[in-house]
From Swiss-Prot:
NCBIfam families: PRK05461.1. This is Protein ApaG. SUPFAM superfamilies: ApaG-like. InterPro entries: ApaG_domain, ApaG_sf, Uncharacterised_ApaG. Residues 2-126 form the ApaG domain. It comes from the Bacteria. One of its GO terms (biological process) is error-free translesion synthesis. Pfam families: DUF525 (PF04379).
Length: 126
């Protein structure tokens, strides 16, 4: 664990995309908007992502790759980077979590944690 691990805060907002979903075919599309806030004193570049996505049946999908939405943004201190992406689940409920592989401007590699967040149809849970 790096001292820089806590220098990045990840905020998430999710939305069910009804018009592009097909419940009769067990296809539920969710978008998620991620805001990555650099609370540190150095710029930090997002190099990789690692997601673990679990649906209500316990089916686990893992997604790893370079950057996010085709970008590897450098986030200056006290600023934020935001993007929107999506995922399709076989069930109306699931969770996602993971990490971003980051590198500071001084070259130190560290992980930014993406805490678990829920993907759910509106009104499904109270």
């Amino acid at each position: 664990m790096s001292a820089l691990d806590d220098s990045i805060r990840v905020e998430v907002k999710t939305e069910y995309i009804e018009q592009q979903s097909s419940p009769e075919d067990q296809k539920y599309l969710f978008s998620y908007t991620i805001t990555i806030v650099n609370l540190g004193e150095q710029a930090a570049k997002l190099e990789t992502r690692h997601w673990i996505i679990t649906d209500a049946n316990g089916k686990i999908s893992e997604v790893q790759g370079a950057g996010v939405v085709g970008e590897t943004p450098t986030i200056p201190p006290n600023t934020a980077y935001q993007y929107t992406s999506g995922t399709v689940l076989d069930t109306p409920l699931g969770i996602m979590y993971g990490t971003y592989g980051m590198v500071s401007e001084s070259g130190e590699r560290f992980k930014a944690t993406i805490k678990p967040f829920r993907l759910a149809l509106p009104g499904l849970l109270h």
